[in-house]
Amino acid sequence: MESVSKESYLPSFHQFPLCASLSEFESASSKETQSSALKNISPHPYDILQAPNSRALISALKTLQNKICRLESEKTHARDRLTNLSRAAGEHKKVLESEKRSAEWAAQEATSQKNDVAMQLNNAEQRCSLLEKQLDYMRKMMENADIQNNPIHQIPAQKEQKDMLEMQSKLQKLEVLENECLRLKATHKSSENKIQFLEEKLSVEEQERKALQDKAAQVQTSLEVNRILLSSASSQNSTQRKVKKKKQSKQKNAISKEPSSKEPLSKEPPSKCFFPKAGELPFVAGKSTTSSHSLSANVQNMLHMMKHQSPRVSQKDPKTVEHKPSILPGGSRSIPTRLMSSSTGDTLSDILLALQDELGQMSFEHQELLKHIDETKNTDMREDLERELDYLVKQMEIKSDQIIKLKRHQLNVAKLKKTAKKQPRPPSTTKPAEDEQNIGATDPCTPRNKGNLANGTGTPNSKASLELLKSVRKIQMTLKKDDIMWEK
């Protein structure tokens, strides 16, 4: 029992609160009054020592007494703290009030000082205005007094001096105007010289462009001629094959009917369908032979020359047909390709050189314009020169693009030439029967092949010629556009 009572009473008295609130102090004070009242009352006669847990009760009572003493001491200490805090708060309030009063007083003093300064400034301004008026009045009075004191002969001298000063100012203005007129005349002359120089350059460029257009037209005419030759060669091959097939069928019929009669093939009369006549050339746009800058007229002129001067198309020499009947199918394909390769290479190189010359002239003009811009001081002239320079730079960029395209096209043409040289050519034989068999085996006469040969897409050289035609047309269009922009 003693151990149980110790565990129940003692642990609750070891840990007590360090700080207590006012309500706890009030409850403690009420308890003290109650305990003091209980002390006056006589307790019941009870013997604690006779109780079974007397030791525990005695120890608990002792701890209670100690705790009560501690609480009373803490209460007094807390009361002292509260009084000190209230005093400190009052002092702090007094200090704050004194600071507020001092700040208000300082603000009032500052406003009063500002008002005083403003009043003083207004008074000073008024005095200054009055003094200025007085000074003006005194000046007028002095001038009037001088005029009255001076004699009469001094007045015209003063007028003469004034007139002289006015004349000098006018003469100076006239000199300035004359200098400006001279400067404007010089600028006008320089602008006229520049305009003449630019007109000369324009005429030179127009001539060069016309020459380039003529060269491009010649290239196109040569390409058209090559295409026409290819189509005519394909039509000749097809007609020759048909004629040879008919001959073979006729010979077979003749051999079956008359075995004794044996005529050599070489003594047969030459076929009239081997070479087309001048009117059978694939030419539709008319037959005028006058020279002009248009492409159709140039093509007509070339075809007229071919019809009247070419030994291949003319039917005056039938020996050429009789002696070499087997070389023409292979040779008719090789000749236009050689012509086309030589003509295209020369024209491309000429066009490239002309474009490079134009680019060099443009670069020289660019340098001259930069020098003029550095030398000129007039803003309007400088703006005009800067505009010309911008336009020149754009033209140079266009020319450089054209040169790059032409160089690429030259490389493509060179590659196509190499591939065409590497391709094996058909061997030329003398026997007509073998030629017929080879032609029948390799080149069957179908409508698709005829169409390809007529269009000029059967060989890589014809493709190259078509590409060159497109590039030349593009160059012509760009040159025409450049002419229009330059005239603007």
UniProtKB/Swiss-Prot annotation:
Biased composition (Basic and acidic residues): 259-270, 314-325
Ranges in coiled-coil conformation: 71-226, 377-403
GO molecular function, one term: microtubule binding
Basic residues biased stretches: 241-250
Function summary: Required for spindle microtubule attachment to both kinetochores and centrosomes. Also functions to tether minus-ends of spindle microtubules to centrosomes. May act by forming ring-like structures around microtubules, or by serving as a cross-linker or scaffold at the attachment site.
Record carries keyword Cytoplasm: yes
Short name of any one Pfam family annotated for the protein: Cep57_MT_bd
Keyword Cytoplasm: yes
Family: Belongs to the translokin family.
UniProt lineage: Eukaryota, Metazoa, Chordata, Craniata, Vertebrata
Membrane-crossing residue ranges in chain numbering: none
Keywords: Centromere, Chromosome, Coiled coil, Cytoplasm, Cytoskeleton, Kinetochore, Microtubule
Region span, Disordered: 232-272, 311-342, 416-464
Biological processes annotated in GO: attachment of spindle microtubules to kinetochore
Self-association and partners: Interacts with clip1, mis12, ndc80 and zwint. Interacts with gamma-tubulin.
Subcellular locations according to the entry: Cytoplasm, Cytoskeleton, Microtubule organizing center, Centrosome; Chromosome, Centromere, Kinetochore; Cytoplasm, Cytoskeleton, Spindle
Annotated Polar residues bias: 452-464
Protein's name according to its UniProt entry: Centrosomal protein cep57l1
Broad class of where this protein is predominantly found: cytoplasm
Any one Gene Ontology cellular component term annotated for this protein: kinetochore
